[in-house]
């Protein structure tokens, strides 16, 4: 193996591969949102409003997800990035 072969083997993924991966992420995200209840967006905004009473945060610092298992079990996951004091 020559030195040139070593550098040629580390090619960046093509733009088509990157676009395909991004599209798969978007489709998976939309499929996850399709099964959410009608009240979910309003509940998310109300939770953010309560947190804002105590801490200054922006919408991108809060992640709310509703996961549903096959066992008829729903899990509400809330992740908040709190600012430093």
Curated annotation (Swiss-Prot):
Pfam families associated with the record? MinE (PF03776)
* SUPFAM superfamilies associated with the record: Cell division protein MinE topological specificity domain
Query: Which InterPro entries does the entry mention?
Result: MinE (IPR005527), MinE_sf (IPR036707)
Disulfide-bonded cysteines: none
Which one GO biological process term can you cite for this protein?
A: regulation of division septum assembly
A GO term from the CC aspect: plasma membrane
UniProt keywords, alphabetically: Cell cycle, Cell division
Superkingdom to which the source organism belongs? Bacteria
**HAMAP family named among the record's database cross-references:** MinE (MF_00262)
Family (UniProt): Belongs to the MinE family.
- State the protein's purpose: Prevents the cell division inhibition by proteins MinC and MinD at internal division sites while permitting inhibition at polar sites. This ensures cell division at the proper site by restricting the formation of a division septum at the midpoint of the long axis of the cell.
What is the designated name of this protein?
Cell division topological specificity factor
Q: Which organism is it from?
A: Shewanella oneidensis (strain ATCC 700550 / JCM 31522 / CIP 106686 / LMG 19005 / NCIMB 14063 / MR-1)
Gene transcribed to yield this protein: minE
């Amino acid at each position: 193996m020559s030195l040139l072969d070593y550098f040629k083997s580390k090619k960046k993924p093509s733009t088509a591969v990157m676009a395909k991966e991004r599209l798969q992420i978007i489709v998976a995200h939309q499929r996850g949102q399709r099964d959410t209840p009608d009240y979910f967006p309003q509940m998310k905004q109300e939770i953010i409003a309560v947190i804002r009473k105590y801490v200054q945060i922006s919408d991108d610092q809060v992640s709310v997800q509703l996961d549903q298992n096959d066992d008829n079990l729903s899990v509400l996951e809330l992740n908040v990035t709190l600012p430093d004091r």
